[in-house]
């Protein structure tokens, strides 16, 4: 290498050494710069999203047994599979026929009269004309695992024993029933199976809820519905997990992502309503008409999504849990926007 080359190298701050040596040094330097840039980019805080308060949590319900009466709670954990209060999770128990097919208040309306009390390691069940029964939350691992069927999809459930099976059978008086419990080690029902044609939906799993981990309705939406009904209905007809006050009627239809407490939620879809909404939660009598017929008169979906909702009216919203945490009654509800 000539003197002119050595001078040029000196200007660049590279020693006059063999070409292979300084090229290696240069490469290492460039690599260090690149890694530093990547590290800086990763270390930069993400652009903070704006929070717009849209309401306040006025009520929280957990429904331990599918279709049975909900338990009102002041505070709850929010897991990726739904609400949890202590050791009790939302819709982790389900009544089934002996062949494993689910039974809900659609088939047995009097299920809505089964009251559940949370008692440390037990659930206490009460129903009209029945002696209370205590159900342990933790079941023996030796209990039989049933292959169950829920809205056409397979899911497992651990048998809760003969005593509670006889209790439900005696109460409903139509056929033999079993009670099963979901275990987090079991495989839940996934988005891909719940909505095989809706590939855009985020991925999540549920145990025995109909569609999603969280069901939310605003108080104002119920008020709006009741202005159209001869016989007023209460929120328990619709079995939400979270009720929101302080917003306009059906404003929840527009909420894509929410922050409540330290829980982040993402909209899945609107809640299509069925005949279950016509079961009176105080009497266990099914009407099969109202409030469903009135909802159909003004809450049908846009024609562009008719393949998803068919002729079901929409009332309430389903959400998935994007960040687990806890929430409580009185928490502000924030809409997260970019």
UniProtKB/Swiss-Prot annotation:
Chain ranges of the MOSC domain: 188-336
PANTHER family linked to this entry: MITOCHONDRIAL AMIDOXIME REDUCING COMPONENT 2, MOLYBDOPTERIN COFACTOR SULFURASE MOSC
Report the residues modified as N6-acetyllysine: 156
Cofactor requirement: Mo-molybdopterin
Q: What is this protein for, i.e. what is its function?
A: Catalyzes the reduction of N-oxygenated molecules, acting as a counterpart of cytochrome P450 and flavin-containing monooxygenases in metabolic cycles. As a component of prodrug-converting system, reduces a multitude of N-hydroxylated prodrugs particularly amidoximes, leading to increased drug bioavailability. May be involved in mitochondrial N(omega)-hydroxy-L-arginine (NOHA) reduction, regulating endogenous nitric oxide levels and biosynthesis.
Q: Is the Flavoprotein keyword given for this protein?
A: no
Q: Which gene encodes it?
A: Mtarc2
Q: What is this protein called?
A: Mitochondrial amidoxime reducing component 2
**What Gene Ontology terms describe what this protein does at the molecular function level?**
molybdenum ion binding; molybdopterin cofactor binding; nitrate reductase activity; nitrite reductase activity; oxidoreductase activity, acting on other nitrogenous compounds as donors; pyridoxal phosphate binding
Entry comment on modification after translation: Ubiquitinated by PRKN during mitophagy, leading to its degradation and enhancement of mitophagy. Deubiquitinated by USP30.
* Record's subunit section: Component of a complex composed of cytochrome b5, NADH-cytochrome b5 reductase (CYB5R3) and MTARC2.
Residues in cross-link Glycyl lysine isopeptide (Lys-Gly) (interchain with G-Cter in ubiquitin): 59, 138, 144, 156, 173, 187, 289, 296
Q: Which UniProt keywords apply?
A: Acetylation, Isopeptide bond, Membrane, Mitochondrion, Mitochondrion outer membrane, Molybdenum, Oxidoreductase, Peroxisome, Transit peptide, Ubl conjugation
InterPro entries membership: MoCF_Sase_C, MOCOS_middle, Pyrv_Knase-like_insert_dom_sf
Q: Where in the cell is it found?
A: Mitochondrion outer membrane; Peroxisome
Report the EC number(s), separated by commas if there are several: 1.7.-.-
Entry's Gene Ontology cellular component terms:
mitochondrial outer membrane; mitochondrion; peroxisome
Q: Which cysteines are joined by disulfide bonds?
A: none
Give the membrane topology, semicolon-separated if more than one: Peripheral membrane protein
Q: Where is the transit peptide?
A: 1-35
PROSITE patterns documented for this protein = MOSC (PS51340)
Q: Which domain of life is it from?
A: Eukaryota
The processes (GO biological process) annotated in the record are:
cellular detoxification of nitrogen compound; nitrate metabolic process; nitric oxide biosynthetic process
Residue spans crossing the bilayer: none
């Amino acid at each position: 290498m000539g003197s002119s080359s050595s001078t040029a190298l000196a200007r660049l701050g590279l020693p006059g050494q063999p070409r292979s040596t300084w090229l290696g040094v240069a490469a290492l330097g460039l690599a260090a710069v690149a890694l530093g840039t990547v590290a800086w980019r990763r270390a930069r805080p993400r652009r903070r999203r704006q929070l717009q308060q849209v309401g306040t949590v006025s009520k929280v319900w957990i429904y331990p047994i599918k279709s049975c009466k909900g338990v009102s709670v002041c505070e709850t954990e929010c897991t990726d599979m739904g609400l949890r209060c202590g050791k009790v999770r939302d819709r982790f128990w389900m009544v089934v026929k002996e062949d494993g097919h689910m039974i809900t208040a659609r088939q047995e309306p009097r299920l809505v009269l089964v009251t559940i009390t949370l008692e440390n390691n037990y659930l206490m069940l009460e129903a009209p004309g029945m002696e209370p029964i205590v159900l342990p939350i933790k079941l023996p691992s030796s209990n039989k695992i049933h292959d169950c069927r829920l809205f056409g999809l397979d899911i497992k459930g651990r048998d809760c024993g003969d005593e509670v099976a006889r209790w439900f059978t005696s109460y409903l008086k139509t056929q033999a029933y079993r009670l099963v419990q979901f275990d987090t080690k079991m495989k839940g029902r996934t988005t891909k199976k719940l909505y095989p044609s809706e590939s855009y939906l985020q991925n999540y799993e549920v145990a025995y809820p109909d569609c999603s981990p969280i069901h939310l309705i605003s108080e104002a939406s119920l008020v709006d519905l009741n202005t159209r009904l001869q016989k007023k209905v209460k929120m328990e007809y619709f079995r939400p997990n979270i009720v929101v006050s302080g917003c306009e009627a059906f404003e929840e239809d527009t909420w894509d992502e929410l922050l409540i407490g330290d829980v982040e939620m993402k909209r899945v879809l609107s809640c299509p309503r069925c005949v279950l909404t016509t079961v009176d939660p105080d009497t266990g009598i099914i009407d099969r008409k109202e409030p469903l017929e009135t909802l159909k008169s003004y809450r049908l979906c846009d024609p562009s999504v008719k393949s998803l909702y068919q002729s079901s009216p929409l009332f309430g919203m389903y959400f998935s849990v994007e960040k687990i945490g806890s929430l409580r009654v009185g928490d502000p509800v924030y809409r997260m926007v970019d």
